[in-house]
A protein has these predicted regions:
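Amphipathic alpha-helical interface elements
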Residues: 1-159
Length: 159
C-alpha cells in the first residue's frame, strides 16, 4: 500500500514533468538555442531549475490558468510539508483534508462515515471497516482530481 507521502510525491513528480513540457514548448526549438540558452536556464543552478519558478513563468505567460497554478502550488506545498514532518499522515487526517479540499480540481470530498446506531451496538470491526472505506473514497477522489489536473496540463500548448 502506498503512503500518503509517497502518493503526493509521485503526483508532484508527474506535475513537474507536465510543467517541464510546457516550459520547453515556450522556448525556441533550434539546437543552438536549446543547448546554449535553454538547458542552462533549466538545469542545476539555473534560474528555472526550481519547479515553483517554472510554474510561475508558465502562469505569467498565460499558458495555465490561475486555478491550475494554485492547485500545483498547493500540492507542492503539501509535498514539502509531508517531507519535513516526522508524523505519518493518512488521507483522512485533518492536516491533509484541509489542503486537498482547497484544490480547484477536487470535486466535493465524500462525507465522513456516520454510524446511525447506538454506541454500544457499534463494534470496533465495523468502525475500522468504515474508516478504511472512507480512506479509500478520499484517496480515489484525490486520484481523479490529480489525474484531471495532469491531463489538462499535458494537453495544453504553450503558444
Amino acid at each position: 500500500r502506498q503512503t500518503l507521502s509517497g502518493f503526493i510525491q509521485t503526483a508532484v513528480l508527474l506535475l513537474a514533468e507536465a510543467v517541464d513540457q510546457l516550459i520547453l514548448q515556450a522556448f525556441r526549438k533550434d539546437d543552438y538555442a536549446v543547448k546554449y540558452a535553454v538547458e542552462p536556464l533549466l538545469e542545476g543552478s539555473g534560474p528555472l531549475a526550481n519547479l515553483s519558478v517554472r510554474l510561475k513563468l508558465i502562469y505569467a505567460l498565460g499558458v495555465i490558468s490561475r486555478d491550475e497554478y494554485e492547485d500545483v502550488e498547493l500540492l507542492v506545498a503539501l509535498n514539502n510539508e509531508l517531507e519535513q514532518e516526522k508524523t505519518v499522515y493518512s488521507f483522512t487526517d485533518d492536516e491533509v483534508l484541509g489542503p486537498i479540499s482547497m484544490l480547484h480540481s477536487m470535486t466535493a470530498l465524500p462525507p465522513p462515515p456516520t454510524l446511525h446506531m447506538p454506541e454500544d451496538v457499534v463494534d470496533d470491526a465495523l468502525r475500522t471497516m468504515q474508516e478504511q472505506r472512507y480512506q479509500q473514497m478520499v484517496r480515489s477522489a484525490l486520484v481523479l482530481s490529480i489525474t484531471d489536473l495532469i491531463t489538462r496540463l499535458e494537453n495544453k500548448k504553450a503558444f
